[in-house]
Amino acid sequence: METVNNNLQQFLHFQKVERGLSNNTIQSYGRDLKQYIQYVERVEEIRSARNITRETILHYLYHLREQGRAETSIARAVAAIRSFHQFLLREKLSDSDPTVHVEIPKATKRLPKALTIEEVEALLNSPQGRDPFSLRNKAMLELLYATGMRVSELIGLTLSDIHLSMGFVRCLGKGNKERIIPIGQVATEAVESYLANGRGKLMKKQSHDHVFVNHHGRPLSRQGFWKMLKQLAKNVNIDKPLTPHTLRHSFATHLLENGADLRAVQEMLGHADISTTQIYTHVTKTRMRDVYAHFHPRA
């Protein structure tokens, strides 16, 4: 008998090979579904997907709430479970889709935190040295703020993606979707300086074409970038909550605050749905209200 665990491996393979989803998305699916399957097998004592019912899933969601999971976390789990069971039905590995009448809890969209322009300038000016690490860190921060790309896209850049003389970079976003993003003079100079005077020294005996590397000469990881960002933010006394996406959020917010077209920002960010980009318009409206309340004599 085919087990639910076997089905999970088939599902993840399909998402990677057939749909071309990113490794981060695959890992997220895997984490949520492994927890779900563990519950189904251990608590409900179900081994086959054909025996999973709507009640099974509702029990699992109740279990997540008892654990104190946030609605956003539960909504993500339901989305993964639904996608999994739809796949099983399509592949005739199940007789029905038990998620049909299971509603996804509405997750309240939290507004992304953006740095002020002054905070961004302080952060970007923090790597001051001419050593390879300072040149690398400066190039990464300038490029992130200049393009709004995701950290996973930044660390995935290869030498053939960088077109400094033409003023753009090419990056592969979610689902391997390619996009071309313009970059300004400051970011161009920072990347040029790193490539000319930093990368070669960090590479040591390694041989690959990733742009940003660690002290072993290997491609930099997300964890490596995150560690660097936290340290630099601490150096310039930025005490706001930071995430690896902070500069991406700041890029979008500052463009819109200065009158950029929403569709153009959507394209640069690589958002499939403009409603995702519209979150940033709420950020700018919140900022406007704060300015009004602070400076208007009759506010």
UniProtKB/Swiss-Prot annotation:
It comes from the Bacteria. Residues 110-293 form the Tyr recombinase domain. SUPFAM superfamilies: DNA breaking-rejoining enzymes (SSF56349). InterPro entries: CB, DNA_brk_join_enz, Integrase-like_cat_sf, Integrase_catalytic, Integrase_recombinase_N, Integrase_SAM-like_N, Recomb_XerC, Recomb_XerD. The active site is at 150, 174, 245, 248, 271, 280 (o-(3'-phospho-dna)-tyrosine intermediate). It is found in: Cytoplasm. GO terms for biological process: cell division; chromosome segregation; DNA transposition. GO terms for cellular component: cytoplasm. PROSITE patterns: CB, TYR_RECOMBINASE. PANTHER family: PHAGE INTEGRASE-RELATED (PTHR30349), TYROSINE RECOMBINASE XERC (PTHR30349:SF81). Belongs to the 'phage' integrase family. XerD subfamily. This is Tyrosine recombinase XerD. It comes from Halalkalibacterium halodurans (strain ATCC BAA-125 / DSM 18197 / FERM 7344 / JCM 9153 / C-125).
